[in-house]
Amino acid sequence: MTNRIVLAYSGGLDTTVAIPYLKKMIDGEVIAVSLDLGQGGENMDNVRQRALDAGAAESIVVDAKDEFAEEYCLPTIKANGMYMKQYPLVSAISRPLIVKHLVEAGKQFNGTHVAHGCTGKGNDQVRFEVGFMDTDPNLEIIAPARDFAWTRDKAIAFAEENNVPIEQSVKSPFSIDQNVWGRAIETGYLEDLWNAPTKDIYAYTEDPALGNAPDEVIISFEGGKPVSIDGRPVSVLQAIEELNRRAGAQGVGRLDMVEDRLVGIKSREIYEAPGAIALIKAHEALEDVTIERELARYKRGVDARWAEEVYDGLWFGPLKRSLDAFIDSTQEHVTGDIRMVLHAGSITINGRRSSHSLYDFNLATYDTGDTFDQTLAKGFVQLHGLSSKIANKRDREAGNN
């Protein structure tokens, strides 16, 4: 049986050099798989050809933008998915989709191994490998950058010794990962927590201080899904792309945070996610109007746990599936419109309307037309505070308060 390695191929130096390296290591063929997740930049046909030129037996490019938006970004919107209340899981939600297509390619080409280019210090090694274990445990996993101390210098030396066609350029000091949902920047001078990020690291967002005129936008949802912007029907992908442009032009969606990595270390990360942040903020605002108080309280805890599961690489796990089912059940009435102003790096919600709204004007108003029966409040207050009152009485008598 021929050994076949299915490689998560980015088109960069490391995974290009990995093709001939892996071929030699297992004496077999390499199937390179690349996904277009809306990351922009290089033409994907060029990426495909580079893999073939490096010696791949097959090079597959998958246009997965709509699939990514509908099946990975949309659940993140419904879950208000923010790890540590800030990070909208830009890289974390893309890894299970890459895993899915690598496993499919493994079945198509009778793959025996699967490989990725992650190091041993990051979260992505976990996301990839747990995903492979969950979906096809028969594939043997190879991680050359981690397992064989693969460095950039070693990669270039191997390429020169083996005539691998690579384009050497001045190396960016940063590690960058991007897709339509956002952009992640790390390492380089950012590893010193006191160093402020310079303007040149940003690509999805303009400087919030530019003074652009405010941009007012209306985002409409049906069952928690964005369906139109300013009255124009959009797909989820189109909604993300348009808000990337509009919110990005206002400097919305920049994050600078110290993140608790799964492997136990803290890491400074810079993110740009204008469309993601705008959609999640709008969705949260609509949930405030349409979800009952106790359910909303409980969902906030579920949302946080969902983000942790996804961040930790457990997309295919049983808890994540159960959390998905709960979250989906909460979205039945999350239908309506949110109006927001994008300006100078901020989002201001200034309008909400929904045919499923739980806001009752006549109960909320303090003016004429008030239907709230305030005579019921006194008894409610007494009963609400009764258990606390009894406990404090006991503690006072015991001299503890």
Swiss-Prot record:
GO cellular component, one term: cytoplasm
Pathway this chain belongs to: Amino-acid biosynthesis; L-arginine biosynthesis; L-arginine from L-ornithine and carbamoyl phosphate: step 2/3
Enzyme class per UniProt: ligase
GO molecular function terms noted in the UniProt entry: argininosuccinate synthase activity; ATP binding
Catalytic reaction annotation: L-citrulline + L-aspartate + ATP = 2-(N(omega)-L-arginino)succinate + AMP + diphosphate + H(+)
Sequence positions that bind ATP: A8, Y9, S10, G11, G12, L13, D14, T15, T16, G117
GO biological process, one term: argininosuccinate metabolic process
Subcellular location: Cytoplasm
Record PROSITE patterns: ARGININOSUCCIN_SYN_1, ARGININOSUCCIN_SYN_2
EC number(s) stated in the UniProt entry for this protein: 6.3.4.5
UniProt-recorded name of the protein: Argininosuccinate synthase
Species this chain originates from: Corynebacterium glutamicum (strain ATCC 13032 / DSM 20300 / JCM 1318 / BCRC 11384 / CCUG 27702 / LMG 3730 / NBRC 12168 / NCIMB 10025 / NRRL B-2784 / 534)
